[in-house]
Amino acid sequence: QPNPDEFVGLM
């Protein structure tokens, strides 16, 4: 499961 922190990095 992807971490929220990494998802923010994509943004």
Swiss-Prot record:
Compartments, as annotated in UniProt: Secreted
One Gene Ontology term, aspect cellular component: extracellular region
Reported tissue expression: Expressed by the skin glands.
Residues in coiled coil: none
Protein name, entry field: Kassinin-like peptide K-II
Residues bearing PTM Methionine amide: M11
Organism listed in the record: Pseudophryne guentheri (Guenther's toadlet)
Residues the record lists as Pyrrolidone carboxylic acid modifications: Q1
Lineage start: Eukaryota, Metazoa, Chordata, Craniata, Vertebrata
